[in-house]
Amino acid sequence: MAPDNMELLDYLYGASLECGIGHVDTDTTLEEILMKTIYVNATFFTMDKENQIIENGMMIVQDHTISYIGQHDEQQLADADHVVNLGGKWIMPGLVNAHSHIVMTLLRGIGDDMLLKPWLETKIWPIESQFTTEIASVSSQLGIMEMMKSGTTTFSDMFNPNGIDAGAVMETIGETGMRGAFSYTIFSLGTEKDQKANLMGAEQFSKNYKAFADGRLTTMVAPHSPYACTPEAIMESARIAKENDLMVHIHVSETDFEILDIEKRYGSRPVEHLRRLGLFDQPTVMAHGVILNDEERAILKQHDVRVAHNPISNLKLGSGIADVVSLLDAGIKVGVATDGVASNNNFDMFEEMRTAALLQKGMYKDATKFPAQTALAMATRMGAEAIGMGHTGSLEAGKKADFITIYPYNKEHLQPLSEAYSHLLYAARGNDVCDVYIDGKMVVKDGRCLTIDEEKVIAETNRLQGTLSR
């Protein structure tokens, strides 16, 4: 029997000093949660195209999906299976990390203060060559745990498959409840036999995991970069993507050295090189795009190539600052991303989008550039669209029920409450997140991950990192 308004008090769970009150009972079965759950007593930052904010609103979730968001509807309340009083929290869509490397999470802090090329060739790739399936799985759990606890509900990732059972790692990711794309990186390294095996592995992985974990997880075709893949490997990547109707995910135009190297090898800059090879015939996510000219931006727009902007990683590796304002002005879809924590060194998307906004203002010497609404959209709705997951990223009817909660009342840096939109960009931090829901299921409660054994993963992380030679 549905509760009346007085009985809503019976639905307040898990009081805590950090996150206030108002949680769904995590002992409730998933089937019960997915019947008709109504969330009330909250401010909803929808991140729809109109950037609507609904104060004291109501959101209905059925079958993993938002079926209604708006003002109170007494009839809907009367028909609810569950009512969750959110205790006045701020609710926003889960954040979307458009480019990451979770398998590398164990490498946090290794190889600081290095440029990209020596960092990859003398630190990252040699250590990754020692990875086992156990290391890759634990590292992925650690990365996803950090992502979810700081508000990320969707990610797009590339991993080095060398020496690991990629399917087993994907199974581990599926158990966390995370949404996203986990992509098998294609390299032209080693012998010709090694390269053929890599391509075969990537194609098989793409077929096996195109729709996985009840549709929450997928994969993309991921040639590493124009400098780490031969033209033949790029063309094979394009074929695999086309035949399996998959997106492409690739590092492009990240450094000045890359531009000069590709021009020397192939007679054209990276974007034109990839266009000639047919890679952009499938929807493509281009990580970085730091070094681009107007002609290249026109090519990206023409082929609907999307860009994953990684401001902190690009700064840390000394690669430069991408001109995101020009990308947006050209009509190119852009999402915010952290890259891997080996070059960031965290997965805090609040910090990432704030840095993105401040860099554009400083680069243009114009405080009107890159307003809060744009930066927040790039980390939610626009980011989701950029990686081909437009079914999430905003709080709208028909979208997946991926959302996060913040309890602002005991946080000095989120006062005064009247300027909440500004605070979400310029003041909020990942550790302000209280609860995280993916597909309508709570995966983080009061800042604790419900789907991953936190203590075990942290202990295993430190044990396993000690087995690696640096």
List where the protein language model places each region:
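His/Asp/Glu-enriched, well-ordered alpha-helical/loop segment
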Residues: 276-283, 325-410, 427-428
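Metal-coordinating catalytic core of metallo-dependent amide/deamination hydrolases
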Residues: 164-290, 295
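Divalent metal-coordination and catalytic microenvironments
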Residues: 42, 59, 64, 88, ...
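Alpha-helical scaffold segments that flank or form the walls of functional sites
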Residues: 108-178, 201-212, 462-470
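Active-site gating loops and adjacent loop-to-helix segments of metal-dependent hydrolytic enzymes
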Residues: 106-138, 176-177, 181-184, 190-191, ...
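C-terminal cap of metal-dependent C-N hydrolases
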Residues: 400-458
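N-terminal metal-binding scaffold of metallo-dependent hydrolase/deaminase domains
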Residues: 10-12, 20-23, 28-77
